[in-house]
From Swiss-Prot:
Comp. bias regions, Basic and acidic residues: 325-334
Protein name as it appears in the record: Translation initiation factor eIF2 assembly protein
InterPro entries reported for this sequence: CDC123
GO biological processes: eukaryotic translation initiation factor 2 complex assembly
Stretch list, region Disordered: 64-95, 325-351
Family matches, as PANTHER family: CELL DIVISION CYCLE PROTEIN 123 HOMOLOG, D123 PROTEIN
Keywords assigned: ATP-binding, Chaperone, Cytoplasm, Magnesium, Metal-binding, Nucleotide-binding
Gene behind this protein: CDC123
Main subcellular location: cytoplasm
Ranges of Acidic residues composition bias in the record: 85-95, 338-351
UniProt KW DNA-binding keyword: no
């Protein structure tokens, strides 16, 4: 959900967005929608988080629990470290996981259950902006400490924890004439915000780590339960997509019509899908609010908001007529190791459709002459990254990062000592 963090939130943009309510944000939380669509999502496990763990994520500094001597599936050069690795035995009692040992144990067990490698996220956001600190420079986590390191280094995760309802109104704040009441007492508003944040049922989502082909991930925009438009998520040019465009659009439209259109509680939302070869099955990756905070990628929000929403004509017939058929003998949902063996078999079948369109959603791809179409080496989320010396240390293996952290600790200790002496 943190995809468009460089843009101010709320209605200050002047764009004619529908009113963004707190219930809309909660409906886009992974823990809310995953049970509904589990059979069409990649394999994942959800771990409820308590206040102690959330306080750990919010706390300044990165202190990791002591590392297991031989964590399952971890390489010798994994680059994962604990700040207590080089500490004195007397410091062993500084273990942050003491306050959430059950969660720590659940995370260990879940990593093992999902094959030894997982990709983490919180309710809305994955820590993609923090992969610079990972030894593999991606979301792959083999130990609990890998997960904690990514979560505590991520601005996206901080947004989930501190700003989930920014730009929203409560479901009772909207007046009958459609105008939104504005709180004028800042103290009361701050207190209300803190209370709301504390009521969010935060979860750690651990998804089985698989290598997705980024060229086959797509973002889809829904208004009034109509699929308006869709586009690539990856901003590079892939020539082969143009030959697949019509087939991909049909498959995604059918998936939306049958799976999401009448089952998601809100009429306006944005969803991400993955359509791997042989391109006959659609996987739901994420659901985001139809709001400025969601990155429109190849579109602008002004374009999307100005698109005409297809509606019923005077005769009551829809602009789009579809005849849907369920194909027998379809592949199981665990093909390519993506799906969940525990999903109900009835929801695993592929869907085919004989389709007649009078409204066709625009499917935007990156053109070959786009000046930004070949930025394969361009780093993403650069606004959230740290200085070069930190990045270089993270890339030099465990020795380099441990040395950097030791120097960092020395600097912090020296500054604390200077502050104490100055205040004496």
């Amino acid at each position: 959900m943190a995809g468009n963090n460089n843009t101010p939130l709320g209605s200050s943009s002047g764009l004619p967005f529908p009113t963004l309510k707190r219930s809309h944000i909660l409906h886009c939380s992974y823990h809310y929608w995953h049970p509904k669509y589990r059979s069409v999502t990649p394999k994942a496990r959800l771990i409820p988080l308590n206040d102690a763990f959330l306080n750990y994520l919010r706390a300044d500094g990165i202190i990791l629990p002591p590392q297991d001597e031989n964590p399952p599936g971890a390489d010798d050069d994994s680059g994962i470290y604990s700040l207590s690795d080089d500490s004195d035995p007397d410091d062993d009692d500084v273990d942050p996981s003491i306050q959430w040992q059950e969660i720590h144990a659940q995370i260990k067990a879940t990593i093992e259950e999902l094959g030894g490698k997982v990709a983490p996220k919180l309710n809305w956001s994955a820590p993609k902006d923090a992969t610079w600190i990972s030894a593999t420079n991606d979301m792959q986590c083999r130990t609990p400490n890998d997960i904690y390191l990514l979560l505590k280094s991520s601005d996206f995760v901080t947004h989930d924890l501190e700003h989930a309802f920014d730009g929203c109104v409560s479901d009772t704040e909207e007046k009958s004439d459609g105008e939104v009441e504005v709180e004028v007492e800042e103290g009361k508003e701050k207190e209300q915000k803190q209370a709301e944040q504390s009521r969010i049922p935060y979860h750690l989502v651990l998804r089985k780590y698989i290598t997705l082909n980024p060229s086959l991930e797509f973002r889809c925009f829904v208004r009034d339960r109509k699929l308006l438009c869709l586009c690539q998520r990856d901003l590079n040019h892939f020539n082969f997509l143009f030959g697949l465009r019509d087939n991909l659009r049909d498959k995604i439209q059918t998936f939306f019509d049958i799976r999401l259109r009448d089952t998601f509680p809100d009429p306006d939302f944005v969803f991400d899908v993955y359509v791997p070869p042989p391109h006959n099955r659609v996987w739901l990756i994420d659901i985001n609010p139809f709001a400025l905070r969601t990155d429109p990628l190849l579109f602008s929000w002004l374009e999307i908001l100005n698109l005409k929403v297809p509606s019923c004509d005077d005769d009551g017939e829809s602009d789009t007529v579809r005849v849907e058929m369920r194909r027998g003998g379809a592949e199981r949902g665990t093909e390519n190791g993506i799906g969940d063996e525990e999903s109900e078999g009835g929801d695993e079948d592929d869907l085919d459709a004989a389709t007649t369109f009078s409204f066709v959603p625009e499917f935007r791809l990156v053109e070959h002459d786009d000046p930004e179409a070949y930025g394969f080496a361009t780093p993403r989320y650069s606004a959230h990254k740290l200085p070069r010396d930190v990045v270089d240390a993270s890339r030099s293996g465990p020795g380099g990062m441990n040395e950097f952290l030791g120097q960092w600790q020395d600097i912090l200790a020296k500054r604390i000592q200077e502050d104490e002496e100055g205040g004496a």
